[in-house]
Design a protein with these regions (language model features):
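Structured alpha-helical
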Residues: 1-89
Length: 89
């Protein structure tokens, strides 16, 4: 497969709280992160999320409160979903 990613991914396993407008709060685990986005492990992600869908997320379990970020669904894999960070308008 041709890798067209602009930013290098780094392994990172942390808890991420997703606040979804339809499904409510979901606690998921990240697999890796880059400057532009994050991959999260979600069982049956295709049945819960759609490409282009935007929602917020916040890393959990840090010594200080993490910022809430806007995330957009950009790709699916059998193990989860790729999300990109959205800039606030």
């Amino acid at each position: 497969m041709d890798n067209k990613r602009e930013f290098r991914r780094s392994p990172l396993k942390v808890q991420l709280r997703i606040d979804h407008p339809v499904h409510g709060q979901m606690l998921v685990t990240t697999r890796d992160i880059s400057e532009s986005g994050v991959f999260v492990v979600i069982d049956d992600a295709r049945s819960l999320l759609n490409i282009g869908e935007v929602f917020t997320g916040q890393v959990q379990g840090l010594p200080v409160e993490a910022p809430v970020v806007r995330l957009e669904v950009v790709r699916f894999e059998p193990s989860g979903v790729g999300l990109i960070f959205q800039q606030d308008a």
